[in-house]
Structure formats: structure tokens, C-alpha cells
Amino acid sequence: MTIKRGFTLIELLIVIAIIGILAGVLITSLSGQRVKAYNANALTTLESVKPIAFGCVLDNKELTTYTTTDGGGAICAGITENWPSLETTKTKWKYESLTSVPDDATFSYVATSGVAGTAPTITCTQTGCVKSGTGW
């Protein structure tokens, strides 16, 4: 009598199916983390503008409008720092609105990743940046 060693075809197929299910679950959970990372990057990018914008309004300079919805152009007149670019390919981040009142040393700029009110939105003022919407 010979001793058979090895796995049957059914056992191998079951193992492959289990690996496939685990890979599917892993990929699904990681794609959500990727979007959260893009959103966190947008928040960091917008927070980096705040000290420059605050310096502009303290110098009684009005903030200038970005050249495109994803950034570009000087933050205010007389400086070389530009509005930073936002991730537009994968998450569709874009600047929505900009207001500044140099006499009051106040400003506000808003960026969103989709439809304002439901999508992740960041509102920055002289006191800080605030996240709102879903997807964080």
C-alpha cells in the first residue's frame, strides 16, 4: 500500500478562496484609509497658509484670489508665497471661497472635496482650520 502525501484539489481551492476573501477585505479597508490620508494632507496644506495669510492682513494687505480652484497665485500682494495646490485628481479638493478684511485683521478661506455641506470641507480663519462634512 502506498502512502499519498499532499493536498487534494478541493483543499487547495478552499485555501485560495480564503486568501481571495481576505485580500478583498484588506483592499476595501485600505481604500478608505487612502481617502482619509488625502483629506488629512489637504488639512495640513491649508493650515500651512494660515500664518502667511495672517501676516498679510496684519500688514493691511488683502488676500488675493487663487488663480485656479486648485491653487496658484500669490496669497497677497508683495509676497512670493503662492496658494498651495490641492489634490484634484483622486479626491477633487478645490478652493471654494475667500474673504479678507485687513482693517479687522480677519480672513477666511474654504476648500471642499465635492459638494459643500456633505463632502469633507475645511474652513480656515485667523483662529485656525476647522473640518466639517463627512469622510474624515
Where are these regions (language model features)?
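Short, contiguous strand/loop micro-motifs
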Residues: 32, 39, 124-128
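N-terminal single-pass transmembrane signal-anchor helix
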Residues: 2-30
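Generic N-terminal leader/processing signal
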Residues: 2-3, 34, 48, 124
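Membrane-proximal N-terminal amphipathic helix
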Residues: 35-62
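Alpha-helix termini
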Residues: 19, 30-37, 72
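Periplasmic/extracellular, small/polar-rich flexible segments of pilin-like filament-forming proteins
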Residues: 54-136
